[in-house]
């Protein structure tokens, strides 16, 4: 059981009720001292305030103190306080009843009532003990969300739970610097640190036990007060004698009585005695020391009541009361024993307040701020008032219903009488200067407050008020600086201090200097000395009749008065006055003491000396009719003039004041002012700076700008809410919405995953279906294709299937690739208009050597030939196919080195190097299950066989002519067919402006001159036949068709109008048309006939010298002279320009063409015996724009737009770009990088058409494309440098798109 009894808490409704004397539940009092001092202090200070260190005896008191009274506590959570926490988290947890042990206990009344001071914060129930309340709160589990994992205790806050867990884990990070003790909480460490402090100022007067606070001592004194009961005093004293508290704490010596123990401590252990620095209350009979007056009085009544009847131990004089005895003892005190000065202060005598003698006054004046007073002069003591003593005076002071008095040095101690207060002051505060107690009626100096009180009762209360007024000196004091007249010196001093305190800067501290002869006040020391020297040089002996007025030795006194206290204390320095105001008037600014002194002096307390004098003046007026005035004349002390009336004398004094008083000048600008108020306003202007601030209406903070104020409002006065998008509920914190999401919207759902393919399913049925279709039906097929996911039973089938994913047959006309040769053949027939001849039977045995040779030549041509050069041949996207390739026989993959091919076969097909027989065997097994009945080819799938059968049946015709309804296999053939429906074939003139068109270039240029023919929905219209075309290619076909008919018009007319149009033949490589089939070289491969022009054949020869034209093949050719003449004739008739057969570049004259051939194509110049090939005269699709036909430079760099003569120069130029700038080309608009300028240009084209629905329109001819690279190819082929729209302002470069210009400017010209 703990030594500290659980005190019964006070009622919450009556906080001022006293504690009951009876103990609760029969708990016995136990004053046994605990062996561990640290545990004792922890037990005592368990109800201590952490902010102000004040100790309380119950939980309700400290709770009320923290909420309402403590100034150092700002929003403290009561639950976080150690005194309000759970029993396990408190140092005195052993005093509480654990909830686990109180399950069967009776809580008593659970509904609220006057006797149950502990209400529940969650419901309406209340309890009589804190332990019952704590146990009950555990039942509110919905209000206490945090649970201890060790003991399952519930908490309201997480911090309380974490603090409680430290008691289980033993986490003690707060270590004592004096010893090895460690604690888990900082407040426990603070309580422990008090054990190391040896200063315990509060000691029990009975058992001499020390305490750290007055509240702990007060709680301890309740134990001794209960021992004073008559029926229990004997037994309690006997019980106390049996306790261990009678042992000395230093030497363990035992004593029978506490008085003996106290004497022992005072004699043998003076360092532990309470009179180390001050004396205690001492008994006049046995000289025993006491701290409390109640202990002293009880001691004298119980011990010395029968020995002596209040007689003096020095002179044997007897008194009726103890107060008179102690008052008499003051007369035996020697002046040498008092530690004070012998120089009295005149002003101090006048300012001692009479209000201090009233019972209701509180002597709360700091003695350190008092002026030192003179020792009291022995006076004849007044007569005794035995008849006036009441019966209550003889009883103990502790039982009298008297008002209490407080000490001016230790405000917490209370005294029932002035006599005991005087004993306390002389015994406990000898080091403090003694006050002078002055009677305001007769100015008699009394040594103590008790003597002053007795003097007032005996002398001035027995007289008639009229006599008191007549006994007062009839003297009137006049102010030397104005016409104010007062009745006493105190009022005059108050008037000068308040009204004339700031006469000049030298007297700023309210210094007042009074003459000791005439009591005239001066503002400076020099003016006072001059007054004494001139006026009182022979009048040094003239004084008033009062004995006090003859004692001063120092003529100059500086005084400072507090205008906020009721008793108007005075001070001898400004520092002491400031200290007094800071300690006793915290809520009043110090500056108000000087600024508003004049105003506050008018509203003094009724108990102040000035108010008393004013009251006396009113009494005199009531008795005598008017205050007494000095008889005789008014003499001026400056010039000696005499006046019979006061008004004339005051008028005369004003003339002296104007010359004597210093002028009020500004210290900054030396400007003069008539009064102090105007001077103060003017000086304030020098020190004032007007600034504008923006003030927050909520917290009154100031800001210099509106932005700072708005930022403050957003940060401090804006509430951030969190809304759940699922249920639209609003929360005030992030933690709350996280908890809401975790509770309301976190539903568990099972996901079923297949362990074989890692697919997830929401229900088990879907998983079963997946296993049935994908794993049960294909158990035998373990080989799976990585491209399409199809499974096969053997590895051979998988390898055969993989070949379908490789496109090794490439079409060099349009750069498309195909898996099989039959698909390539089909593409050539439908898209590129091969010769319309029947396919020979695939089943024929053998082939002539000539056919095989042509087949090899065509295969080489398809793989190595390139398109004719145009303006964009110098781009980095051209593929170099001259390097030999090594192909895989199984999947068709090609590699540049044989070792790479071997690694591929080993890695992908498990074929080691040298296993040729195995390869053949595998090749034999690679046969499909689907066989063609026509050519006996096998296929692996039905779709492949169906596509193959279509090649035997003919091409599929999907495109229908809207005029005649005929179907065609490709859009190109449909376009050529639609041209035949035109009726304006012979004119070749524009049907809008009737302008004759002579060439394809003129036709295309003229179409751009009629923008009204463009339609965004249907496309263009031909200016000759007015048919609608949907693309630029179709328009070019129209131009070729119309211009071709125009050039052949004369020949047709000579043969007759009934003759049909001659059939044209196209080259399979460059798509040029020729009138005769003999102009083409015929090649036959796999039963498909192909025709190449002479230029394409020469180009293939230059690329592959081993390829020759088959012997017997009809090679058309003419002599050089004949060719030149023919060309010249053509130029005259048709106006056509010559074109180079190798590079397809046109020239104005034949000489330029020959010069070009000699310089550029020197290796292709034929011998003299050979004949010059005929250059085709008609081209359906010109490779360069008309603007580029006049230029000789045909190669242009995309990066810097430089133009070169041949391919070699531009390749070197591009290589230099790559060396200098690298392969990374960055787009400055989106920071993406590309490895070539062509890709960057295509990317910039996409930037230009962002948000256009995926369409790309040519900025020159307005052709629409669905891919950016197609538009780029169109610009390269159809438009030249002159067609570029956007010019750079800082360099000569031009661009087709604005995004190209922006990227160029940011890259090249940005600073």
UniProtKB/Swiss-Prot annotation:
Residues with site note (Breakpoint for translocation to form PAX5-ZNF521): 72-73
Residue ranges with Polar residues bias: 359-370, 387-397, 1168-1178
Tissue expression per record: Predominantly expressed in hematopoietic cells. Present in organs and tissues that contain stem and progenitor cells, myeloid and/or lymphoid: placenta, spleen, lymph nodes, thymus, bone marrow and fetal liver. Within the hematopoietic system, it is abundant in CD34(+) cells but undetectable in mature peripheral blood leukocytes, and its levels rapidly decrease during the differentiation of CD34(+) cells in response to hemopoietins.
Zinc finger (C2H2-type): 47-67, 118-140, 146-168, 174-196, 202-224, 246-269, 281-304, 310-332, 405-429, 437-460, 477-500, 513-536, 560-585, 634-656, 664-686, 694-717, 722-745, 752-775, 783-805, 809-832, 886-908, 930-952, 959-981, 1020-1042, 1065-1083, 1138-1161, 1195-1217, 1225-1247, 1256-1279, 1286-1309
Keywords: Activator, Chromosomal rearrangement, Developmental protein, Differentiation, DNA-binding, Isopeptide bond, Metal-binding, Nucleus, Phosphoprotein, Proto-oncogene, Repeat, Repressor, Transcription, Transcription regulation, Ubl conjugation, Zinc, Zinc-finger
UniProt biased composition (Low complexity): 87-102, 349-358
SUPFAM superfamilies reported for this sequence: beta-beta-alpha zinc fingers
Feature: compositional bias, Basic residues: 1-10
Disease linkage: A chromosomal aberration involving ZNF521 is found in acute lymphoblastic leukemia. Translocation t(9;18)(p13;q11.2) with PAX5. The translocation generates the PAX5-ZNF521 oncogene consisting of the N-terminus part of PAX5 and the C-terminus part of ZNF521.
PANTHER family given in the database record: C2H2-TYPE DOMAIN-CONTAINING PROTEIN, KRAB AND ZINC FINGER DOMAIN-CONTAINING
Binding partners and assembly: Interacts with EBF1. Interacts with SMAD1 and SMAD4.
Name this protein carries in UniProt: Zinc finger protein 521
Organism the protein comes from: Homo sapiens (Human)
Taxonomic classification: Eukaryota, Metazoa, Chordata, Craniata, Vertebrata
């Amino acid at each position: 059981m703990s030594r500290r009894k659980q005190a019964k808490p006070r009622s919450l409704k009556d906080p001022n009720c006293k504690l009951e004397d009876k103990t609760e539940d029969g708990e016995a009092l136990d004053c046994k001292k605990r062996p561990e001092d640290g545990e004792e202090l922890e037990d005592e200070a368990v109800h201590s305030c952490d902010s102000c260190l004040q100790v309380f005896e119950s939980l309700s008191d400290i709770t009320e103190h923290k909420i309402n009274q403590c100034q150092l506590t700002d929003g403290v959570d009561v639950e976080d306080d150690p005194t309000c926490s759970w029993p396990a988290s408190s140092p005195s947890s052993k005093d509480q009843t654990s909830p686990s042990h109180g399950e069967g206990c009776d809580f008593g009344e659970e509904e609220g009532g006057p006797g149950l001071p502990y209400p529940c914060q969650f419901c309406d129930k209340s309890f009589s003990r804190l332990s019952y309340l704590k146990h009950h709160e555990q039942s509110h589990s919905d209000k206490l969300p945090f649970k201890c994992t060790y003991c399952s205790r519930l908490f309201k806050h997480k911090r309380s739970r974490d603090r409680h867990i430290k008691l289980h884990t033993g986490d003690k990070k707060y270590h004592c610097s004096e010893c090895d003790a460690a604690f888990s909480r900082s407040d426990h460490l603070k309580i422990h640190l008090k054990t190391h402090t040896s200063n315990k100022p509060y000691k029990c007067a009975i058992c001499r036990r020390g305490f750290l606070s007055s509240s702990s001592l007060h709680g301890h004194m309740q134990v001794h007060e209960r021992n004073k009961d008559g029926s229990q005093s004997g037994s309690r004293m006997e019980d106390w004698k049996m306790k261990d508290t009678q042992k000395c704490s230093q030497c363990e010596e035992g004593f029978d009585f506490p008085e003996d123990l106290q004497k022992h401590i005072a004699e043998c252990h003076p360092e532990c005695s309470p009179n180390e620095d001050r004396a205690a209350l001492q008994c006049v009979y046995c000289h025993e020391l006491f701290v409390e007056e109640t202990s002293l009085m009880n001691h004298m009544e119980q011990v010395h009541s029968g020995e002596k009847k209040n007689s003096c131990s020095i002179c044997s004089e007897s008194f009726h009361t103890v107060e008179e005895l102690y008052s008499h003892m003051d007369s035996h005190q020697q002046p040498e024993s008092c530690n004070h000065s012998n120089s009295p202060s005149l002003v101090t005598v006048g300012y001692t307040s009479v209000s201090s003698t009233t019972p209701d006054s509180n002597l709360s004046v700091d003695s350190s701020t008092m002026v030192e007073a003179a020792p009291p002069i022995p006076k004849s003591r007044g007569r005794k008032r035995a008849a006036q003593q009441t019966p209550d005076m003889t009883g103990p002071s502790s039982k009298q219903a008297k008002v209490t008095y407080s000490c001016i040095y230790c405000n917490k101690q209370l005294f029932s009488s002035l006599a005991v207060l005087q004993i306390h002051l002389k015994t406990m505060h000898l080091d403090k200067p003694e006050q002078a107690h002055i009677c305001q009626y007769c100015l008699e100096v009394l040594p103590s407050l008790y003597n002053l009180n007795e003097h007032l009762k005996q002398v001035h209360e027995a007289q008639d008020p009229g006599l008191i007024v007549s006994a007062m000196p009839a003297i009137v004091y006049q102010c030397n600086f104005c016409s104010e007249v007062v009745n006493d010196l105190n009022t005059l001093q108050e008037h000068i201090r308040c009204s004339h305190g700031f006469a000049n800067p030298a007297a700023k501290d309210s210094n007042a200097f009074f003459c000791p002869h005439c009591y005239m006040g001066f503002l400076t020391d020099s003016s006072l000395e001059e007054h004494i020297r001139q006026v009182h040089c022979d009048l040094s002996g003239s004084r008033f009749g009062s004995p006090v007025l003859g004692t001063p030795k120092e003529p100059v006194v500086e005084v400072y008065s507090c205008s906020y206290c009721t008793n108007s204390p005075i001070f001898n320095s400004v520092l002491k006055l400031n200290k007094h105001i800071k300690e006793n008037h915290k809520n009043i600014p110090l500056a108000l003491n000087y600024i508003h002194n004049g105003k506050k002096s008018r509203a003094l307390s009724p108990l102040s000396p000035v108010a008393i004098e004013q009251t006396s003046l009113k009494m005199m007026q009531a008795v005598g009719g008017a205050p007494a005035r000095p008889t005789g004349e008014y003499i001026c002390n400056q010039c000696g003039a005499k006046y019979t009336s006061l008004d004339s004398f005051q008028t005369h004094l004003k003339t002296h004041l104007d010359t004597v008083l210093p002028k009020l000048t500004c210290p900054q600008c030396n400007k003069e002012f008539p009064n102090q108020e105007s001077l103060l306003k003017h000086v304030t202007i020098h020190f004032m700076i007007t600034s504008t601030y923006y003030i927050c209406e909520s917290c009154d903070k100031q800001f210099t700008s509106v932005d700072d104020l708005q930022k403050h409002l957003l940060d401090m006065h804006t509430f951030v809410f969190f809304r759940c998008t699922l249920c639209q509920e609003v929360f005030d914190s992030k933690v709350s919405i996280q908890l809401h999401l975790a509770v309301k919207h976190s539903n568990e759902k099972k996901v079923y995953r297949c362990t074989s393919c890692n697919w997830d399913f929401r229900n088990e049925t879907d998983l079963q279906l997946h296993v049935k279709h994908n794993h049960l039906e294909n158990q035998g097929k373990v080989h799976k294709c990585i491209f399409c996911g199809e499974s096969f039973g053997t590895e051979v089938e998988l390898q055969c299937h993989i070949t379908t994913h490789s496109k090794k047959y490439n079409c060099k006309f349009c750069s498309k690739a195909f898996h099989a040769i039959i698909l390539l053949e089909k593409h050539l027939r439908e898209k590129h208009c091969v010769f319309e001849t029947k396919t020979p039977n695939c089943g024929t045995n053998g082939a002539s050597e000539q056919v095989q040779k042509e087949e090899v030549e065509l295969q080489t041509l398809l793989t190595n030939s390139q398109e004719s050069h145009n303006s964009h041949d110098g781009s980095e996207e051209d593929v170099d196919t001259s390097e030999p390739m090594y192909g895989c026989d199984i999947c068709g993959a090609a590699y540049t080195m044989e070792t790479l091919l071997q690694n591929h076969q080993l890695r992908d097909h498990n074929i080691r190097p040298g296993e040729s027989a195995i390869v053949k065997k595998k090749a034999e097994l690679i046969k499909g299950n689907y066989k063609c009945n026509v050519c006996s080819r096998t296929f692996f799938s039905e779709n492949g066989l169906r596509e193959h059968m279509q090649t035997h049946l003919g091409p599929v015709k999907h495109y229908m002519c809207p005029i005649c309804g005929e179907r065609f296999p490709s859009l190109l053939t449909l376009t050529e067919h639609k041209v035949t429906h035109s009726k304006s074939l012979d004119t070749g003139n524009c049907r809008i402006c009737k302008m004759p068109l002579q060439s394809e270039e003129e036709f295309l240029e003229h179409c751009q001159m009629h923008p009204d023919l463009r339609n965004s929905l249907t496309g263009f219209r031909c200016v000759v036949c007015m048919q609608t075309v949907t693309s630029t290619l179709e328009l070019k076909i129209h131009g070729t068709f119309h211009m071709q008919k125009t050039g052949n018009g004369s020949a047709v007319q000579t043969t007759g109008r009934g003759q049909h149009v001659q059939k044209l033949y196209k080259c399979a490589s460059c798509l040029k048309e020729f009138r005769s089939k003999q102009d083409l070289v015929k090649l036959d491969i796999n039963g498909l006939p192909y025709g190449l022009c002479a230029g394409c054949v020469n180009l293939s020869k230059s690329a592959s010298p081993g390829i020759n034209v088959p012997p017997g093949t009809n090679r058309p050719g003419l002599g050089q002279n004949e060719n030149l003449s023919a060309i010249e004739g053509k130029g005259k008739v048709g106006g056509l320009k010559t074109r180079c057969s190798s590079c397809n570049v046109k020239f104005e004259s034949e000489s330029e063409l020959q010069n070009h051939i000699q310089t550029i194509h020197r290796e292709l110049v034929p011998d003299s015996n050979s004949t010059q090939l005929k250059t085709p005269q008609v081209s359906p699709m010109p490779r360069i724009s008309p603007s580029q036909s006049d230029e000789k430079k045909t190669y242009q760099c995309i990066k810097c737009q430089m133009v070169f003569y041949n391919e070699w120069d531009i390749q070197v130029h591009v290589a230099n770009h790559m060396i200098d700038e690298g392969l990374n080309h960055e787009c400055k608009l989106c920071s993406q990088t590309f490895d070539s300028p062509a890709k960057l240009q295509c990317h910039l084209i996409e930037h230009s058409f962002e948000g256009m629905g995926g369409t790309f329109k040519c900025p020159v001819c307005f052709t629409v494309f669905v891919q950016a690279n197609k538009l780029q190819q169109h610009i390269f082929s159809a438009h030249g440098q002159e067609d570029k729209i956007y010019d750079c302002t800082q360099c000569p470069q031009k661009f087709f798109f604005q995004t190209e210009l922006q990227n160029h400017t940011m890259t090249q010209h940005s600073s």
